[in-house]
């Protein structure tokens, strides 16, 4: 009797352990691992190579700048992969009407294809405006208002709306953006060794409002776009990025990963 009870407890313990491990890996599999790709023609000219790179590096999400007029190429690419697709777009000179045009264009593409573009990843960078230093507060408030309106519009069309932001926005601005201006943040977290420290405000807001948070790593070589060695993992490679992200994930498993960008990695 004692032996049977012990054996039963042992079996239950093994089953429980297997279940926990399975849930852990399922959670990891569902966590965002995104790749940026800015060149729209890559999905037609290098589709197989891109998909192979995605699979080899265990990405499950692609932030791709699509040519929204080339519906045939978007459909053909979508037929080859089940990766989650988001339209990557944006420019400092985009006003709310231009942003809404892009949202509507994505919606219309989805009506014409069986592949689904889940939403938009919008990289506006208002701090690149010529008068930023003189009118920072006004520009930022206008940007936040635009993002709130754009997010509402995207939601009405059934599209997710993510924002790319730098790690240094003031906490109050981050909170306003997260609360009403997006479904989640992709933080361009370009400062080696301080990735977690620089996510503190974004974590507080995203966790409070139950929004997604993704930390992005730069892979371009130092010297380009004013990048220094402190900003990029170009020399260290994806292996180092994965090690850093693993430490972040172990503490905060809700945080996803993004890598910027495909053309400098292939």
Regions found by a protein language model. Give the residues of each.
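Short, acidic/polar
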Residues: 40-55, 98-113, 169-178, 199, ...
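Aromatic-lined substrate-binding rim segments of carbohydrate-active enzymes
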Residues: 50-53, 61-91, 134-161
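Aromatic- and acid-rich polysaccharide-binding/catalytic face
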Residues: 59, 64-67, 128, 171-200
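Active-site groove signature of glycoside hydrolases
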Residues: 63-66, 106-140, 255-259
């Amino acid at each position: 009797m004692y032996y049977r009870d012990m054996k039963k407890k042992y079996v239950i313990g093994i089953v429980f352990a297997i279940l926990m491990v399975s849930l852990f890996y399922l959670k990891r599999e569902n966590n965002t691992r995104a790749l940026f790709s800015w060149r729209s023609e890559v999905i037609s000219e290098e589709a197989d190579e891109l998909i192979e790179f995605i699979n080899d590096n265990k990405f499950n999400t692609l932030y791709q700048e699509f040519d929204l007029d080339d519906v045939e190429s978007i459909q053909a690419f979508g037929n080859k992969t089940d990766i989650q697709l988001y339209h990557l777009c944006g420019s400092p000179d985009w006003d709310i009407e231009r942003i809404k045009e892009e949202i509507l264009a994505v919606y219309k593409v989805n009506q014409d294809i069986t592949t689904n573009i889940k939403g938009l990843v919008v990289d506006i960078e208002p701090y690149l405006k010529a008068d930023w230093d003189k009118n920072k507060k006004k520009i930022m408030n206008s940007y936040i208002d635009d993002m709130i309106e754009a997010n509402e519009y995207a939601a009405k069309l059934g599209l997710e709306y993510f924002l790319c932001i730098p790690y240094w926005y003031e906490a109050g601005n981050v909170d306003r953006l997260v609360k009403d201006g997006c479904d989640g943040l992709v933080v361009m977290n370009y400062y080696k060794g301080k990735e977690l420290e620089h996510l503190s405000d974004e974590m507080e807001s995203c966790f409070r409002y139950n929004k997604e948070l993704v930390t992005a790593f730069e892979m371009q070589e130092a010297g380009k776009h004013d990048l220094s060695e402190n900003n990029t993992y170009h020399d260290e490679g994806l292996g180092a990025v994965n090690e850093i992200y693993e430490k972040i994930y172990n503490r905060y498993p809700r945080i996803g990963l993004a890598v910027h960008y495909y053309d400098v990695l292939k």
